[in-house]
Amino acid sequence: MRRREFIKLSASASALGLLPSEIGKTLEALNGSVNCDTTNRRLVLIELKGGNDGLNTIIPMDNYSYYKNSLRPDIHIPVNSSNYNSLVVDSSLSGSLQDLAFNPALLIGNNQGFKGLYNAGMLRIMQSVGYPSQNKSHFASIDLWATGNDGNSWDNGKESGWMGRFMENAYAEVFPTNYPFAIQMGSNNTWLGFHAEHEHGLALNIEGQNSENFYTILSGLAGQAPTNIPNTHHGDEINYIVQTDAFSNTYANSIETAYNNGSNYNDSAYYPDTDLSNQLKTVARLIRGGIETKIFLVTIGGFDTHNNQNQSNNDINGRHTELIKELSGAVDAFVSDINSDSIGDDIVGLTFSEFGRKAKQNNNRGTDHGEIAPMFVFGKPVKGGISGNNVDLNEANSNNNWQIQTVQYDYRQVFSTLMQDFLGANDSVIDKTFFDH
């Protein structure tokens, strides 16, 4: 794979048949990232667990009448002459195939949330992200995203995750370390994406801001290691736990030190009191405190909105809106925090979800499992803008169960480009991470 601009098509990706439109324009990308020192760079991944409704997150205005009257008469996001100017993503694109409006909830935050990030040139909207042969099971699709596979390559290295493979190949020369290469927050279940083929990082579930809990949680993992581990899949899982346990006390010390040395900028004014906000606040504090962890994964759940997506017909308030508000407020505060000093120069964040929702509402004021969904990439190093055209709503019909299936960007292109162009991975590492495993 040759190094390209952000999400430029690689030789390996071409072999997968991925030919998305406008690929050459996408985040040319990470401003000034190429050939620069990558030592302090970090990725912050935000998982929108449950399958986010992309159509009600960023609204396609080029076919709004069909969206409102035919597909979603009861749960559409109202956009009209009175609020269009405040919700439009980019007024210079009005009337084009990239004419989008933000869900009003994405304006939540001291700096107007995602709208403020876009206006400041720090938000890239990736349209129609997915993978070939989309699986609509939560568990299966989450595992496919975690292992770097798609619906056609289910068994291709499914015992390890792309994050784990990336870390053990990119940082082999410095392993082991006294800090985890990746930290997970907001979920009791360790994400499969952290599982490597040989070495293992440490995923943590950290809630709130109690520094004393860090050492207790980690050191509490210690115990007598089992012997006579079988050479089976079950044995591999035991080995993973044993290796993680071996590093737990060392990791506990480094995390405790970083947390105590770190701080948040004016957190009382910027951070809402929400679970996602507390996770991101902890990430910022650990980074400012000197932790050298490369990848952070935080989670917000509840996006499986089969019913009561809004409170009543034609009312935007409801389950989905509250989730988007939490996302916008937390990211707004996090970006304000990290940009209060120089650490924001080396941090890129992005959102992802295991799949999207159907284009047509169901009979319960909700939406059922779909396929493609947008991703948001944000931070100072990001070149703002929109990648890809609006979804073609006419693609969804009764013959395909109201699905929008055209993938403009494969999720592996997004992640592999960040690994290469931002974290500095070479061709060999990228191929071992996503294609040769």
How would you name each of these model-derived features?
Residues 1-14:
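N-terminal secretory signal peptides and thylakoid transit peptides that target proteins
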Residues 94-214:
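Extracytoplasmic mature domains of secreted/periplasmic and thylakoid-lumen proteins
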Residues 228-332, 337:
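Anion-binding catalytic surfaces of enzymes that hydrolyze or transfer phosphate/sulfate esters
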Residues 39-43, 119-124, 178-179, 291-295, ...:
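Loop/turn elements at helix/coil->beta-strand transitions in domains of secreted/extracellular proteins
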Residues 59-63, 72, 76-102, 305-437:
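Feature marks hydrolase-like catalytic cores characterized by long aromatic- and Gly/Pro-rich stretches
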Residues 49-54, 130-134, 187-192, 302-305, ...:
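Solvent-exposed loop/turn segments at secondary-structure junctions
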Residues 45-47, 54-57, 124-127, 181-184, ...:
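Structural recognition of the beta-strand scaffold that forms the well-ordered cores
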Residues 11, 21-109, 113, 118-124, ...:
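Intrinsic-disorder/low-complexity recognition with aromatic hotspots
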